[in-house]
């Protein structure tokens, strides 16, 4: 299309493959998530793997659940993650 860079498709493909790890503290159990299959920890940090395309949605979800994002870092597939 007129006005679009030829690199747009390449960067979208590259971004689609990127995954980040959110370190989140302060998540709480609420009526909205009470029916989930697992409880949410009230203390400590939780690590959540998030694809690049879902980062904004996940930030909103964490905020709704009362969590605070402490750290965001790129996911390393060869690291010893406990997810």
Swiss-Prot record:
Q: InterPro entries this protein is in? A: CpcD-like_dom
> An example of a Gene Ontology BP annotation on this entry?
photosynthesis
Q: Which SMART domains match?
A: CpcD (SM01094)
Q: Which Pfam families match?
A: CpcD (PF01383)
GO-annotated cellular components? phycobilisome; plasma membrane-derived thylakoid membrane
UniProt-listed PROSITE patterns? CPCD_LIKE
Q: What is its main location?
A: membrane
* Annotated localization: Cellular thylakoid membrane
Q: How does it sit in the membrane?
A: Peripheral membrane protein
The protein's UniProt keywords, in alphabetical order, are: Antenna complex, Membrane, Photosynthesis, Phycobilisome, Thylakoid
Q: Which residues form the CpcD-like domain?
A: 17-75
The residue range of the signal peptide is none
Give the top-rank taxon of the lineage listed in the UniProt record for this protein. Answer: Bacteria
Report the family membership.
Belongs to the phycobilisome linker protein family.
Q: Please give the function described in this protein's UniProt entry.
A: Rod linker protein, associated with phycocyanin. Linker polypeptides determine the state of aggregation and the location of the disk-shaped phycobiliprotein units within the phycobilisome and modulate their spectroscopic properties in order to mediate a directed and optimal energy transfer.
Oligomeric state and interaction partners are given as: Part of 2 PBS rod complexes, the conventional CpcG-PBS rod and a photosystem I-specific CpcL-PBS rod, both of which include ferredoxin--NADP reductase (petH). CpcG-PBS has on average 3 stacked phycocyanin hexamers (PC, CpcA and CpcB). Linker CpcG connects the PC stack to the thylakoid, the hexamers are linked by 1 copy of CpcC1, 1 copy of CpcC2 and the stack is terminated by a single copy of CpcD. The CpcL-PBS has on average 5 stacked phycocyanin hexamers (PC, CpcA and CpcB).
> Under which name does UniProt file this protein?
Phycobilisome 8.9 kDa linker polypeptide, phycocyanin-associated, rod
Which organism does this record belong to?
Synechocystis sp. (strain ATCC 27184 / PCC 6803 / Kazusa)
Gene assigned in the entry: cpcD
